[in-house]
A protein has these predicted regions:
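Conserved C-terminal structural/oligomerization subdomain of aldehyde/semialdehyde dehydrogenase
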Residues: 8-27, 102, 130-132, 202-205, ...
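Donor nucleotide-activated moiety binding/catalytic core segment of transferases
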Residues: 87-102, 162-167, 244-246, 264
Length: 321
């Protein structure tokens, strides 16, 4: 079985050797560069965008993550709000070797969003299988072929929907669906009452869409009183609800402490509330240990590629090289 060979490779310590990773991922990086024109052409066909825009997308979302994975050693993880060129930071959950990793991508998630996460897992020294069940595109098909040709099967591979997953006993399954009981707020606004109102509205919509009813809300200490007030408002608006929509609201100090609290809860559904700086919106879209439901109470599903591209172009967070 492939996972037996993966286990042997991981236990040998070879996957955590920088030279081995550099050689393996370096070949993929070289192939990605060699196929630049083909990839840009496929992007133009898949996305219906100009060649100039697709060159920009290739540079930031394909070539740069591949270069980082091939040429840089895994650095100490930092809690920073990443911008789009730093897409490799989606792998922050892989800041240390975990063993055999299975990535089960959400069916709504574009291939360009999961490919850097696959590279990040390999970069951390994890034998990794990416199971992609989303819409097949020419770009995704080409990148899959390049990855599977360059990376030894016992180190990593990409399989499409319908193909057999050659990993029966992974140490870590990275999936997009996190059923659970926790609703978490990582950042509020200066106007806490308004932010809390948006949060409760998004939560109500989320419950209707996903069937998730949070039993606990963790939030920054500064937002606690505003959230309690908004929950009380919803309770008064829903007299037929036996529990009055009231749930415990626990204030936690700081992102780090809040993240540790959520990790201790195990499986969960985390509802993020972001507003204000654009970097917060980017972070909620890129951080993957917890599934998000709302960015500024607008979207309750995986972000669209168009939103990413427009945001990047308008704010000039990516520069063409």
């Amino acid at each position: 079985m492939a996972d037996e060979r993966m286990r042997e490779l991981f236990l040998s310590g070879k996957t955590t050797d920088r030279a081995y990773r550099g050689e393996t991922l370096g070949k993929l990086y070289a192939d990605v560069r060699a196929k630049k024109n083909d990839i840009v052409g496929f992007l133009a066909g898949d996305l219906g965008r100009s060649a100039k825009e697709c060159a920009f997308i290739y540079s930031s979302m394909i070539e740069k993550p591949a270069r980082i994975a091939a040429k840089k050693d895994w650095t100490k993880w930092r809690w920073l709000a990443p911008v789009l060129p730093d897409f490799i930071t989606t792998g922050r959950v892989y800041r240390k070797p975990l063993g055999l990793v299975l990535i089960e991508a959400d069916s709504r998630e574009p291939f360009l969003f999961v490919f850097p996460r696959f590279l990040a897992s390999l970069m951390a020294g994890n034998p990794t299988v990416l199971s992609f069940g989303g819409r097949q595109t020419k770009t995704g098909t080409l990148l899959t072929e390049l990855a599977n040709a360059a990376i030894p099967a016992e180190f990593g591979m990409i399989v499409s929907e319908g193909e057999e997953i050659p990993m029966e006993e992974p140490d870590y399954v990275f999936a997009e669906e996190y059923p659970g009981r926790v609703c978490a707020v990582f950042d509020g606004t200066a106007d806490y009452d308004k932010g809390a109102e948006k949060l409760i509205y998004a939560w109500r919509r989320m419950e209707g869409l996903n069937g998730v009813k949070p039993e606990v809300i963790y939030c920054p200490v500064s937002m606690r009183s505003a959230l309690v007030k908004q929950i009380d408002k919803w309770a008064r608006r829903s007299p037929d609800d036996p529990d009055g929509r009231k749930v415990p609201v626990i204030g936690v100090r700081g992102d780090e402490e809040l993240a540790e609290k959520l990790e201790a809860e195990g499986e969960m559904f985390a509802l993020y509330m972001f507003s204000g700086e654009d970097t917060y919106a980017l972070r909620v879209a890129l951080d993957r240990p917890y599934k998000y439901a709302s960015v500024n109470s607008v979207t309750l599903r995986s972000p669209s590629m168009k939103a990413y591209f427009n945001e990047s172009v308008n704010s000039k967070t990516i520069m063409m090289r």
